[in-house]
């Protein structure tokens, strides 16, 4: 990631700290990965605090595929198997089966219904029967070591929520342009400025965890 284009949001450490503060206060952030990887920017919200209004914004400007990033332990608790036994996707995106809240939703696709599903999945007392399968929310299972084990948006979302002192669960969705193409760094930065959101890179988060000895969450 060309860090120069992110200087508007501060240096690497400042961007992470600002992102954590925003998440603590219930706001979303934009996360960029490497241009040699997926080369895209994702909305990232803490699952614990995401609102219906934020979900509506995400659906309106995103790809429509809203993902709930969960730890391996939470996926086991909810008995969420992987979507396929052998993952042959380019970046090994760790999709589990999709989900829907068993109660409190209609079609499951509205912003309100998706928030209901997310809250059901991250509830302290959540159990497998609380979720129907398939559904309109797509869980992703994070690497146990976070971004230090896999430099993906999934791990970044979980790490950011955890470092912000919230439940280790995040919601993400890729930002798209009005013509349906994927938003790259310039478009992501322009969108973030317009909507007063912080932008950081996964590289920023990796460096932050390494520098601050945040190498083990156990």
From Swiss-Prot:
Residues in the signal sequence: none
Entry note: cofactor: Binds 2 divalent metal cations per subunit. Magnesium or manganese.
GO biological process: riboflavin biosynthetic process
Pfam families xrefs: DHBP_synthase
Residues bound to D-ribulose 5-phosphate: 37-38, 42, 150-154, 174
Entry keywords, A to Z: Lyase, Magnesium, Manganese, Metal-binding, Riboflavin biosynthesis
Superkingdom of this protein's organism: Bacteria
Protein's pathway: Cofactor biosynthesis; riboflavin biosynthesis; 2-hydroxy-3-oxobutyl phosphate from D-ribulose 5-phosphate: step 1/1
Protein's UniProt keywords contain Isomerase: no
Cross-referenced InterPro entries: DHBP_synth_RibB-like_a/b_dom (IPR017945), DHBP_synthase_RibB (IPR000422)
Binding residue positions for Mg(2+) 2: 38, 153
GO cellular component: cytosol
Needed co-factor(s): Mg(2+); Mn(2+)
HAMAP family with a match to the protein in the record: RibB (MF_00180)
Function: Catalyzes the conversion of D-ribulose 5-phosphate to formate and 3,4-dihydroxy-2-butanone 4-phosphate.
Family: Belongs to the DHBP synthase family.
Protein name (Swiss-Prot/TrEMBL): 3,4-dihydroxy-2-butanone 4-phosphate synthase
């Amino acid at each position: 990631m060309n860090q120069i284009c992110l200087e508007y949001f501060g240096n690497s450490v400042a961007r992470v700290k600002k992102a954590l503060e925003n998440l603590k206060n219930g706001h979303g952030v934009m996360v960029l990965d490497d241009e040699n990887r997926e080369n895209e920017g994702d909305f990232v919200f803490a699952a614990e605090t995401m609102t219906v209004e934020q979900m509506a914004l995400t659906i309106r400007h995103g790809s429509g595929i809203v993902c709930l990033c969960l730890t391996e332990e939470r996926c086991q608790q909810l008995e969420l198997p992987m979507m396929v036994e052998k993952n042959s996707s380019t970046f090994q995106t760790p999709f589990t089966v999709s989900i829907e809240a068993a109660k409190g939703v209609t079609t499951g696709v509205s912003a309100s219904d998706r928030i209901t599903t997310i809250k059901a999945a991250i509830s302290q007392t959540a159990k497998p029967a609380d979720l129907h399968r398939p559904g309109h929310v797509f869980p992703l299972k994070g690497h146990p070591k976070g971004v230090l084990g896999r430099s993906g948006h999934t791990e970044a979302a979980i790490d950011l929520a955890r470092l912000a002192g919230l439940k280790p669960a995040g919601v993400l969705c890729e930002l798209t342009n009005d013509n349906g193409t994927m938003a790259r760094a310039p478009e992501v930065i322009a969108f973030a400025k317009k909507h007063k959101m912080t932008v950081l890179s996964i590289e920023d988060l990796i460096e932050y965890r390494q520098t601050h000895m945040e190498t083990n969450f156990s």
